[in-house]
């Protein structure tokens, strides 16, 4: 057996039914116990994005913290991941992506609430938080907290944080603009170095500018394609729903599609895209300027909504409208490139996808640098931060030259490992989550003067 085949077997085991059920089951439990908070309070959560928490303590604004999380979350999964999910499981995979995103919003709310509640100030005066802190301070299990932090550093160094993103950037630039991989790799590495050596505030500043711009550009282009093909939209949505339960209803009666394959593809890629339950977003949420854990939890859960319900849905619908998903000669980013070119009737569509992929992947690199750094500091202290950042920058450059299949196998393994300690903590601290939520909304109800503020 080769190393790649051994790692592939480990990957299949980690991302098998137990983890998928645990992730979805945790989301379902929290959804029910919190009274469908992700639906009832989504308008309030979206409103909080643009309102400061007066007197809140933290390093960056709640909006900047969300953008840092979105920078790490919105990446190649929104373009390449959706395409691979629909090709593997049919259009029905999009339906299961919607479902896992809906449940994942409750999970994201819970983990980011805990991040603010159990955060601390480090020796440099910065806010530090995330699963490692609420596992240690909430559950009192320090070895499990250290295990999570170790997995977090591994993901940043060898997983979704670096290798898949820079590989996607360099090869997309070569395919679309004929720019050599080495040239793009050097430029990306230098840009990443300039930003991350400035620390969390520089990452947050860059993310606050890049993330909204790239998301608006990508979604606007998708909407243009949808409007140009508006007469096909009802049939496309019906196909997505029908093939979720009857894959043979898919265009062309795609051979080998099953309900289980649609579910597995949609759930796995949905979670891979929005990261709900993996424990990454809480690390960014802990830096937010806020007094209220619940308030930040509400803000953070909008990240899953924006990532999957909005951005991934746009990709999925365009793939179905144009029929690109059912072309066996296409794979990965080329599927989405083809879909957007067909949808707009010009090669400009493919260019927009490549530019979107460039920005999405670049900001994912920035966001994961911060996540890995917080985990690294938890393990060894603040003194090794500069060494960590230099190592991260060098690994970014390396990712352009590694074999693509091996990159994604390693990324899947370490990304999946992060989820287990975090989900154990969410289940173990479920009473804290429920009590904090009830307390916040009770205080909000009795404050008749300002419904956006609560009284202590």
Swiss-Prot record:
An example Gene Ontology molecular-function term: amino acid:sodium symporter activity
UniProt similarity note: Belongs to the alanine or glycine:cation symporter (AGCS) (TC 2.A.25) family.
Alphabetical list of Pfam families matching this protein: Na_Ala_symp
NCBIfam families: agcS
Main location: membrane
Residue pairs linked by disulfide bridges in the UniProt entry: none
PROSITE patterns tied to this protein: NA_ALANINE_SYMP
tRNA processing listed as a keyword: no
Annotated compartments: Cell inner membrane
Record key words, sorted: Cell inner membrane, Cell membrane, Membrane, Symport, Transmembrane, Transmembrane helix, Transport
Xref: InterPro entries: Na/Ala_symport
Transmembrane portions of the chain: 12-32, 63-83, 86-106, 143-163, 179-199, 208-228, 237-257, 305-325, 348-368, 390-410, 414-434
Record-given protein name: Uncharacterized transporter HI_0883
């Amino acid at each position: 057996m080769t190393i790649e085949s051994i790692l592939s077997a480990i990957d299949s085991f980690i991302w098998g039914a137990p983890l998928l059920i645990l992730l979805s089951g945790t989301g379902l439990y929290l959804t029910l116990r919190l009274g469908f908070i992700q639906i009832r309070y989504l308008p309030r959560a979206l409103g909080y994005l643009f309102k400061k928490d007066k007197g809140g303590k933290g390093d960056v604004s709640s909006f900047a913290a969300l953008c840092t999380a979105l920078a790490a979350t919105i990446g190649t999964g929104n373009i390449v991941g959706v395409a691979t999910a629909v090709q593997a499981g049919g259009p029905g995979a999009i339906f299961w992506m919607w479902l896992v995103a809906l449940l994942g919003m409750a999970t994201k709310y819970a983990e980011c609430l805990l991040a603010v509640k159990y955060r601390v100030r480090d020796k440099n005066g910065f806010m530090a938080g995330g699963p490692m802190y609420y596992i240690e301070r909430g559950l009192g299990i320090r070895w499990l907290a250290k295990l999570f932090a170790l997995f977090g550093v591994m993901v940043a160094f060898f997983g979704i944080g670096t290798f898949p993103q820079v590989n996607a950037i360099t090869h997309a630039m070569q395919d679309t603009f004929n720019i050599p991989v080495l040239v793009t790799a050097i430029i990306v590495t230098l840009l990443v170095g300039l930003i991350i050596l400035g620390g969390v505030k520089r990452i947050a500043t860059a993310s606050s500018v890049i993330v909204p711009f790239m998301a608006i550009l990508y979604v606007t282009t998708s909407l243009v394609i949808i409007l140009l093909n508006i007469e096909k939209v009802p049939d496309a949505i019906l196909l997505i729903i029908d093939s979720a339960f009857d894959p043979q209803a898919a265009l062309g009666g795609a051979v080998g599609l099953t309900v289980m394959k649609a579910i597995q593809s949609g759930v796995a890629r949905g979670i891979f895209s929005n990261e709900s339950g993996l424990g990454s977003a809480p690390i960014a949420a802990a830096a937010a300027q806020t007094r209220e854990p619940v308030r930040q939890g509400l803000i953070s859960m909008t990240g899953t909504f924006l990532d999957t319900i909005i951005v991934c849905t746009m990709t999925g619908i365009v793939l179905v409208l144009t029929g690109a998903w059912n072309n066996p000669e296409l794979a990965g980013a080329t599927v989405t490139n083809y879909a957007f070119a067909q949808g707009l009737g010009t090669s400009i569509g493919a260019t927009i996808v490549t530019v979107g992929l460039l920005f999405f992947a670049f900001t994912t690199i920035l966001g994961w640098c911060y996540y890995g750094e917080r985990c690294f500091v938890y393990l060894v202290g603040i003194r090794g931060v500069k060494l960590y950042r230099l190592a991260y920058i060098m690994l970014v450059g390396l990712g352009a030259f590694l074999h693509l299949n091996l990159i994604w196998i390693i990324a899947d393994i370490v990304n999946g490992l992060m989820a287990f300690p975090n989900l154990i903590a969410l289940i173990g601290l479920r009473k804290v989550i429920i009590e904090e939520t009830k307390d916040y909304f009770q205080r909000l109800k009795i404050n008749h003067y300002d419904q956006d503020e609560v009284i202590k």
